């Protein structure tokens, strides 16, 4: 991809041969952001494990990620009142199932009570393709719909590596205080290390970098980051 003059000028601010501590990396990454909007600060970390399909889970960012999350909840009876009170934008049962079956997916996260999953499961081709299918492991198939909605809206994100073993996550906005971004990043590291498979050998996190939506990626001293986060 052809890079513009602005990117090339900003790239000179970052020594690409150096690995920075997390505080320095966040400061540098933010200083290279050149979007006119409030860009996202993202992390990328490569995990070393033989079965990548087993690496997945959820992370609750203490300061959220700055993203507004529109939540849909499939539930019945009093649970609908609980979901609405927690702030879910869309709440219903068969009426919503029919709407989604028609191709509507104008929401960012989906929760369902266990008794709804027989019907929600039929939406697999639509919800699964967009990564919206409720899952017990992710805490989105639950009887406590209020808790699930609150967690999704307060910054809980799902993670899993791509085919190359790299986990990509947005950890906040460029406008966030550095300390809040650092705390979010340390929470990511703590969760990844906590969820590390018991038979993973050697250094589980091989590389780590921080970058803005549009800007320069900054390499992080991953060993120091892990040692000071857990």
Swiss-Prot record:
Classification of source organism: Bacteria, Pseudomonadati, Spirochaetota, Spirochaetia, Leptospirales
Quaternary structure (record): Part of the 50S ribosomal subunit.
CDD domains referenced in this protein's UniProt entry, alphabetically: Ribosomal_L1
Function description: Binds directly to 23S rRNA. The L1 stalk is quite mobile in the ribosome, and is involved in E site tRNA release.
Pfam families referenced in this protein's UniProt entry, alphabetically: Ribosomal_L1 (PF00687)
Membership in a protein family: Belongs to the universal ribosomal protein uL1 family.
Gene Ontology terms, MF aspect: rRNA binding; structural constituent of ribosome; tRNA binding
PROSITE patterns: RIBOSOMAL_L1
Key words of the record: Repressor, Ribonucleoprotein, Ribosomal protein, RNA-binding, rRNA-binding, Translation regulation, tRNA-binding
Residues spanning the membrane: none
Gene Ontology CC annotations of this record: large ribosomal subunit
Name of this protein: Large ribosomal subunit protein uL1
Disulfide bonds: none
Organism this protein belongs to: Leptospira borgpetersenii serovar Hardjo-bovis (strain JB197)
A Gene Ontology BP annotation from the UniProt entry: translation
Gene that this polypeptide is encoded by: rplA
């Amino acid at each position: 991809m052809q890079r513009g003059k602005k990117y090339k000028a900003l790239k000179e601010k970052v020594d690409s041969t150096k690995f920075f501590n997390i505080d320095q990396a966040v400061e540098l990454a933010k200083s290279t952001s050149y979007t006119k909007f409030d860009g996202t600060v993202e992390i990328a970390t490569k995990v070393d494990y033989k079965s990548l399909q087993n690496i997945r889970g959820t992370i609750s960012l203490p300061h959220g990620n700055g993203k507004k999350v529109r939540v849909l909840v499939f539930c019945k009876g009093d649970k609908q009142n609980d979901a609405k009170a927690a702030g879910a934008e869309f709440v219903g049962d068969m009426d919503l199932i029919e709407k989604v079956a028609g191709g509507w997916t104008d929401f960012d996260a989906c929760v369902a009570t266990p008794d709804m999953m027989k019907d929600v499961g039929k939406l697999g081709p639509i919800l699964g393709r967009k990564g919206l299918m409720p899952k017990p492991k992710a805490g989105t198939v639950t009887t406590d719909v209020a808790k699930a909605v609150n967690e999704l809206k307060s910054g809980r994100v799902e993670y899993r590596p791509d085919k190359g073993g790299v986990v990509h996550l947005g950890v906040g906005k460029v406008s966030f205080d550095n300390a809040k971004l650092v705390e979010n990043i340390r929470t990511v590291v703590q969760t990844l290390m906590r969820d590390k498979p018991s038979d993973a050998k050697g250094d589980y996190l091989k590389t780590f970098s921080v970058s803005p939506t549009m800007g320069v990626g900054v390499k992080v001293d991953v060993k120091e980051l892990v040692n000071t986060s857990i």
